[in-house]
From Swiss-Prot:
Record's keyword annotation contains Zinc: no
Native species: Wolbachia pipientis subsp. Culex pipiens (strain wPip)
Gene name of the encoded protein: tolB
Domain of life: Bacteria
The protein, known as: Tol-Pal system protein TolB
GO cellular component: periplasmic space
Length: 418
């Protein structure tokens, strides 16, 4: 097996549905309190078991603490567990290469067992197992799939010995671990995007006056040119079914949105005219496309309804300022965007009909929002200066922000699907 994760999943959900329901957090309410959680590890027999158990515990604690739904109590004593949800972890060596992790999720207030599972895994896969356990805990307590085994891709940028800017496509685990560089920095690269199946990343490269759409295979690290264009290609975005790419194409003074069928390699022009139309993003059901355009004279957001014969764009942004880089929520309920007003940049969200606009973050130059697969958080670029660009997360409910650590400057992020 790939991960050699033999999930001997002894799922013990002994609590009836009526009891389980009260344990779920209503994540749409802003005044809800976090779940108090303790992660406790049992005594280990060997040094290897003890070291790995400690590492796994820390990753689980960090994952659940960072998602903003749990109040993780670190190093809490048993006598303080009176009203907490407790995760108890035990680790034992099965052979020289394999270990078995067992964990138990329980409610100390009612003294009820919520979940018990065991996982056999290779020692080198301990971090993946930590994320897997975090996902299972999140799913059981929140009633929603966790995102701890997902990845982030972005543009990593730094200066070489000649102070020349070097850009690379980077990919890492959602917690910032296991960073890999997919390109060597010899060519200009931009806007990496995960394929819906998670097997590849598409990005744009510019060479000798042409724009190339390149697909990097994440399994074997090979890459292939999907298509080459005269002019400038930008803002690629997969259709939710992964069968097409939607891109912005600038040529002969016009900038329009094209769809590219990945099987036939045929293109179709979606927008036409002298207006600058860019940043396409499809709704999860693929019936609508949101994009940014200056059709009205200033940069605004528009929707095209693919179910109608007339594909006339409908404007949905009417606030002060300019709107850019829209991206549809994976749940389909919101559209994230960048707003520029009076020299300030904002990351915001609105309903697909343009109503209920909310601004979540403000900065000197913040842009390029991308959704987490749970549809509750947004990652974006925060460029405080040309030499200081980082990735930040903001949640929709409390507007809490935190920086995502990267060893170099980082921009243009994208988050993988579940």
């Amino acid at each position: 097996m790939k991960l050699f994760v033999q999930l001997v999943l002894f799922i013990s959900l002994f609590i009836p549905y009526s009891t389980k329901a009260v344990l779920y957090v209503d994540i749409k309410k802003s005044n809800i309190g976090n779940i108090d959680l303790v992660v406790s590890k049992c005594a280990c027999k060997t040094e290897v078991e003890n070291e790995l158990s400690e590492s796994i515990t820390k990753v689980i604690e960090t994952n659940l603490s960072n998602c903003g739904l749990f109040n993780v109590k670190r190093d809490a004593k048993v006598e303080s567990w009176k009203s907490d949800t407790v995760v108890t972890i035990s680790l034992s060596e099965v052979s020289n290469r394999n270990l078995e992790l067992s964990f138990r999720l329980s409610d100390s207030f009612t003294n009820r067992e919520l979940l018990t599972q065991s996982v056999v895994f290779l020692a080198k896969d301990w971090r993946k197992i930590s994320h897997l356990v975090s996902d299972l805990i999140h799913d059981r307590l929140i009633g929603e799939k966790g995102h701890f085994n997902t990845k982030i891709t972005y543009i990593a940028e730094e200066k070489d010995s000649n102070y020349k800017s070097v850009r690379k496509i980077a990919v890492m685990n959602q917690d910032g671990s296991n960073i890999k560089y997919l390109t060597n920095g010899e060519k200009f690269v931009s806007t990496p995007r995960f394929s819906p199946n998670g097997k590849g990343i598409v990005y744009i490269s510019y060479t000798n006056g042409k724009s190339y759409i390149i697909l990097k295979n994440l399994k074997d690290n090979t890459e292939s040119i999907i298509s080459a264009f005269e002019g400038v290609i930008s803002a690629p975005r997969f259709s939710p079914d992964g069968k097409s790419l939607f891109i912005s194409h600038s040529l002969s003074g016009e900038t329009n949105i094209l769809s590219l069928d990945l099987s036939s390699k045929r293109t179709k022009k979606i927008t036409k005219g002298s207006a600058i139309s860019t940043s396409p993003s499809l709704s999860p059901d693929q019936k609508y496309m949101v994009f940014s355009s200056d059709i009205s004279g200033s940069q605004q957001l528009y929707i095209i309804d693919f179910t109608k014969k007339s594909k006339k764009p409908k404007r949905i942004s009417f606030g002060n300022g300019r709107y850019a880089t829209p991206v549809w929520s994976p749940k389909g309920d919101l559209i994230a965007f960048t707003k520029i007003q009076s020299g300030k940049f904002y990351i915001g969200v609105m309903k697909p009909d343009g109503k209920e606009e909310r601004l979540l973050s403000e900065g000197h130059k913040i842009e390029s929002p991308a959704w987490l697969p749970n549809g509750r958080e947004i990652i974006f670029t925060n460029a405080e200066s040309p030499s200081n660009s980082k990735l930040y997360l903001v949640d929709l409910v409390k507007k809490n922000q935190k920086m995502v650590f990267t060893p170099t400057n980082a921009s243009l992020p994208d988050w993988s699907y579940f």
